[in-house]
Structure formats: structure tokens, C-alpha cells
Amino acid sequence: MMNMQSMMKQAQKLQKQMQVSQEEIANTTFVGKSAQDLVTVEFSGDRTLKSLNINPDVIDPEDPETLQDMVTDAVNDALSQIEKVTEQKLGKFTKGLPF
């Protein structure tokens, strides 16, 4: 059975590893794309929108809904990537915890 000092050291080690993983995620750029890459967005891992690029060919004043859908798709694509990487990197730290 581990003593208290050993458990504290292990907890500190896990905390440091988790912090490093969080920093890696925050420093990663995630690119989301709509169909045919007509709209692209870049997010940092902390979910800050860094850029939004729209192909001029899809800008149609008569049909703003299509552009809105493409922007939504690109944003959701990037956020989904962030969520997936976050789960991969940080999920190992929370598995088995009672919350």
C-alpha cells in the first residue's frame, strides 16, 4: 500500500503531465473546413478563432444561408478536432475518477 508521501508525489507528477498536455493543446492550431474547402477557419487549442477565410466565389447576396452553413460547418469541424485531441491527451488523466 502506498504511503501518503508517495501518493502526493504521484499526484504532483500527474498534475505536471496534465499541465504540459494542456499547453500543447493550447499551442496547437486546428483548421476547420467546409465542403470543398470553400470556407476555412483556424482556431487555437484554447478555442480562440484566429482566422476565417471565405472563397469569394461563395459570396452570393441572394443566398446568404449557404455561406452561413459553410461557416458553421467549418467552425464545428475545428471545434470537433479540438475536442478529439483534448480527449486523447487529457482523457487518460480523468479515467476512473468519480465525477
Curated annotation (Swiss-Prot):
Keywords: Cytoplasm, DNA-binding. GO terms for molecular function: DNA binding. One of its GO terms (cellular component) is bacterial nucleoid. Pfam families: YbaB_DNA_bd. Gene3D superfamilies: Nucleoid-associated protein YbaB-like domain (3.30.1310.10). It is found in: Cytoplasm, Nucleoid. NCBIfam families: DNA_YbaB_EbfC. Belongs to the YbaB/EbfC family. Binds to DNA and alters its conformation. May be involved in regulation of gene expression, nucleoid organization and DNA protection. Homodimer. This is Nucleoid-associated protein llmg_0128.
